[in-house]
Amino acid sequence: MSTQIPARQETYDPSQSSGTKTPSHPYDGNPTRSYPKRNAGKFTTYSSQMIAPRKRKAWEYEEEEYEASRDFYQRVTSWYDGAVDLAPQLFREQHFPSYDEFYSLGGVNEKFLEAHEEVKAQEQMDSRYLQHGQLPSINMGKQPIIGVIYGPTGSGKSHLLRALISCNMLDPIPETVIFITPEKNMIPPIEQTSWNLQLVEANFDCREDGTIAPKTSTFRPEFMEMTYEEATAPEHLNIDHPDNIYVKVSKRGPVAIIMDECMDKLCSGSSVSVLFHALPSKLFARSAHCTAFYIFVVLHNMAPRTAIGNVPTLKVNAKMHILSCHIPQFQFARFLYAFAHNISKDLVVLLKAYFSFLQQNQRFSWVMYTPDPVSESFRWCSIDQQYSIIPLNVNIQERFLKTAKSIIKFSETHRKQLERNPKLTDLEKLSPPGTFQET
């Protein structure tokens, strides 16, 4: 008696199909048929439509996003190259891929676009204040202003003080300037003449119709000289005293007080802290004609010999710090570590390198720090030799630094795709006929 062995029927597993193989009977690939598959002791069904080969989509991109991101990519890479030139000890030289390669590999992701939008929004907000990429004034309409100017002898402090008024670097310009010195007759006649001339020059402006008219309510701003003892006398520090000189001049219009060569007096004399915080705000609020009140104190050393006195109070209440590029590098570094709390260490090193660059190439430039600016981009500024106020945009540079690091990381991740394949053939140039010589 013979037993007939039935033929083996092959089952079809959709998960192991390559998409091109035609399954055999009884699972013949009918779209309306369901195929059983054993899974953990149970049968489940899969439709043949789930394993149908997908059509490859054509590569699509947004042209506007492509062009806008190109400009931002070039700005970031150019900024990094400049940072390498300024601080090669911190920033290593990098060979960035071309933008087309970066874009084609998916580098323009959400993080990249978010950084681009943040920079764009910040620059749009800053454009409301800028004129040709520069700030029109150092105070940007804020009042009252207490500023400290640091610089050794011969660094151009006197020229800067006169330029603050004559070059329209204050808004509004003062009608009365009180110049305070340690002793009497310390201002040379030539400097007095320069002050009077530049005060008159700054007071007049040419209008569109060709007429020349004063900017203030007076034709000739007043220049007054006082000693330190006179300026800090009790009757002048008391705002309710009838002989207070500051109350009298504030009734005429904007006032500027300049304290020069008084560092020893400030360190060793009695407390005059009321001159640096209470007096300016009260005078500015009391008189309607006093639309501006400025106090500028000149210090020859950023680190006085004693930590007591009026200098620490002055630094705390100062709304503006202007540093000469003639000061030593270690003093600027100490200033950075004391005030630059909101920026990264890499940007601190970059600021130190930029200050060193100014010391070597633009000796009579200045670096200005404002604790409470109208925009975060204007916290750090530079004043060049033409007295142009240029914002350093440290907050935007922070975003450039983060984006540059992400580009570098992206390039390292896709190193194999970015590597150039070696040439399979090498073409050798043949010499023209008749150039071979027999030996």
Swiss-Prot record:
Assembly and partners? Homodimer. Part of a genome packaging complex composed of packaging proteins 1, 2 and 3; this complex specifically binds to the packaging sequence on the left end of viral genomic DNA and performs packaging of the viral genome. Interacts with protein 33K.
- Gene Ontology MF term list: ATP binding; DNA binding
- Location of the protein in the cell: Virion; Host nucleus, Host nucleoplasm; Host nucleus, Host nucleolus
Q: What is its main location?
A: virion
Task: Provide the residue span(s) of the region labelled Disordered.
Answer: 1-42
Similarity comment: Belongs to the adenoviridae packaging protein 1 family.
- The organism sits in which domain of life? Viruses
Q: Which residues form the signal peptide?
A: none
HAMAP family assigned = ADV_PKG1
User: GO CC annotation: what is one?
Assistant: host cell nucleoplasm
* Protein name according to UniProt: Packaging protein 1
- Which controlled-vocabulary keywords does the entry list? Activator, ATP-binding, DNA-binding, Host nucleus, Nucleotide-binding, Phosphoprotein, Transcription, Transcription regulation, Viral genome packaging, Viral release from host cell, Virion
Source organism per UniProt: Fowl adenovirus A serotype 1 (strain CELO / Phelps) (FAdV-1)
InterPro entries for the chain: Adeno_IVa2 (IPR003389), P-loop_NTPase (IPR027417)
